[in-house]
Each structure stands twice: as C-alpha cells, then as structure tokens.
Design a protein with these regions (language model features):
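Short, conserved loop/turn and helix-capping segments at secondary-structure boundaries
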Residues: 68, 117-124, 187-188, 193
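C-terminal cap of metal-dependent C-N hydrolases
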Residues: 166-208
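Short, solvent-exposed amphipathic alpha-helical segments in soluble enzyme
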Residues: 7-14, 38-39, 98-99, 121-123, ...
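Active-site core of metal-dependent hydrolases
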Residues: 1-92, 112
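Conserved protein kinase catalytic core
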Residues: 29, 61, 115, 182, ...
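His/Asp/Glu-enriched, well-ordered alpha-helical/loop segment
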Residues: 40-51, 78, 95-177
Length: 208
C-alpha cells in the first residue's frame, strides 16, 4: 500500500492535479492495517483532502475501539470514505463515521457490469440501497442516506453546493412525491431534468 500510494501520488495526482480513490476490499484486521498505512502515507505526502477510500469493508468489521482509532486517523488526514452499499459485503457504519468527523459519500460502482448487475445510475435508488443495507427506518435516517448520494458527492468532487437558492447551479430534477423519504423509497419517474438551467429530459425521455 505504501509503494502504491507513493507511485499514484507521483505519477497521477501530481502530474494531473487529481485526487486519488483507493478501492479497499480487505476485511477485518488486514483491512484496518491497510487503512492505517493509507493514512500514514497521506500525511507523509501532504495529501490531506486528496485521498478517498472506496468500500473500506473493514470499518464495519473491527471492534468499536479500533473503529474509533481508524476514524480519528481518517478525520485528521481528511480522507473520505465512499460506499456503493454492495449486497455481498459488510457496510461501514456510515452515520458513526460522520459523527466522528469523517467525510462520507455514496455512489454507484460502475453502474452495471459483470461485477454487479444492480445499478441504474439512479441516485434515489442508490440512496434506497444505502438505507436498506444500513437498516435505516426513520425519516431522518433515510434523508441522511440520501444526503450521502447528493450533497456529499458534490462536496467530494468539489462541485458548487446546490441548495436551490439564487446563484446555485441550476441542476435539479422534478418528481411527484410528498417528501424526501418517500422519494427514496419509491424513486419515482423524473418528470423533468434540468442541467445548467436547460431542460434535458421530460417524462423519462431525453430531449437532446
């Protein structure tokens, strides 16, 4: 992991001025050890805020004391944890990470391919997967899961915040739903999709 991160920092991050996302599948203690190494090299290379770890299953497999130790390292080095809520692995405790000050986001892992057929690019659907795998039942929990798929993703990608206020990017969708939790549970058809203020899809049909 040390040599890998050093090489990525030298050959990719510096050269192209990009962030690094490491997909970490190792479980339990070996995964925790890998997270420690990533945090160590992030600090040594001065890459705070430029590294993310996707999956990080080990965070959901270690004792609470070890989890808090790892979360502190992640928070100090500004390392983001990203999840796609895969069905075959232990999910990191997302809310507990946020409570410890760790940046967390959620997204799709290659949308749909031989790795997993369960993806459509629909982030409302992905938020439902997050909530289902995390056993979120209360409205505020479901909304938290949605926030990882929406605002947290924009923050990670360094995109402008979008609260539908004056000056925000005019990127938004229109759906028919009584509230956000219901929208996550049903992920209804997008009546309209706007990008930069331009209507690009209506009633499920692209307009370009």
């Amino acid at each position: 992991k040390k040599n890998m991160l050093d090489k990525m920092a030298r050959d990719d991050a510096d050269k192209y001025q990009k962030k690094i996302d490491i997909h970490l599948h190792e479980p339990s203690d070996i995964g925790a050890f890998s997270i420690e190494l990533i945090a160590e090299r992030t600090k040594a290379l001065g890459m705070q805020g430029k590294v993310s770890i996707s999956h990080a299953f080990a965070l959901g497999m270690v004792p609470e004391g070890k989890f808090k130790q790892l979360a502190k390292m992640l928070q100090e080095q500004q390392i983001t944890i990203i999840t796609s809520a895969p069905g075959s692995a232990v999910l990191p405790p997302l809310k507990a990470l946020v409570d410890e000050g760790v940046s967390v986001a959620a997204g799709s892992d290659n949308i749909r391919d031989f790795w997993s057929p369960y993806g459509s690019g629909d982030m409302l659907e992905r938020a439902m997967f997050i909530g289902y795998r995390s056993n979120y039942r209360r409205d505020e929990e479901i909304e938290f899961g949605l926030s990882l798929c929406a605002g947290a993703g924009r923050t990670l990608l360094e995109l402008p915040t979008n609260n539908l206020t004056a000056g925000d990017p005019a990127d938004f969708i229109l759906i028919q739903s009584p509230n956000l939790p219901q929208a996550v549970l049903e992920h209804p058809e997008r009546l309209m999709v706007f990008k930069s203020g331009k209507l690009i899809a209506e009633n499920g049909q692209a307009l370009w």
